[in-house]
């Protein structure tokens, strides 16, 4: 089974232009993501998908593989699908290019269900919410699943909405696991054929309302397997986030 991890990387990021090439301990951020992804035991190969020659040059400079894509893509999924269409892979993994601390074990956790069950078309990850701030934040995507681990819904709103427990919504309730809530981790695994099909689907009502592409899958009647992980990473959307990454690395020595 051939499993390809693709890292979409744009240069023209609105909040942090050129972040893929931001230096972290002497390496561009995209190199950190690439090298960590390559350490996942289930990944056969890693490719950076980008629309900028500067990123292509940086990736090739450290010996990585990069593919140029159209500049007209509106989403990372579209960029992913363009590269996937050129490949003969069985499974495609979408690894976010702005998570330089991603743990290779997270990637393997997400891949395992599809590698073991050929009926599964798509998978992703979730991790426990540990603070009231994250539970209420629209920037933290929440997910609820059924008893078998399939996604029921993703939302930027508090999910579930504890109708009779708002007085219990304190940090301690989350850290003690009195309230069991999960945030979505944006790492996706697709059967290649399904990814290409997904990219051709029209945007859906709930997807546009929440600005969450994965809802397109649910609205079209398909299932998403969601695996719980204990690993957490830091997404770099701003220079301030980059400072957090540098602090984390400093603490690790």
From Swiss-Prot:
Annotated EC: 2.7.7.38
SUPFAM superfamilies: Nucleotide-diphospho-sugar transferases
Keyword list, A-Z: Cytoplasm, Lipopolysaccharide biosynthesis, Nucleotidyltransferase, Transferase
Gene3D superfamilies: Spore Coat Polysaccharide Biosynthesis Protein SpsA, Chain A (3.90.550.10)
Origin: domain of life: Bacteria
Coiled coil region boundaries: none
Pathway: Nucleotide-sugar biosynthesis; CMP-3-deoxy-D-manno-octulosonate biosynthesis; CMP-3-deoxy-D-manno-octulosonate from 3-deoxy-D-manno-octulosonate and CTP: step 1/1; Bacterial outer membrane biogenesis; lipopolysaccharide biosynthesis
Annotated localization: Cytoplasm
Catalytic activity as recorded in UniProt: 3-deoxy-alpha-D-manno-oct-2-ulosonate + CTP = CMP-3-deoxy-beta-D-manno-octulosonate + diphosphate
GO CC annotations, alphabetized: cytosol
Protein name in UniProt: 3-deoxy-manno-octulosonate cytidylyltransferase
Gene name in the database record: kdsB
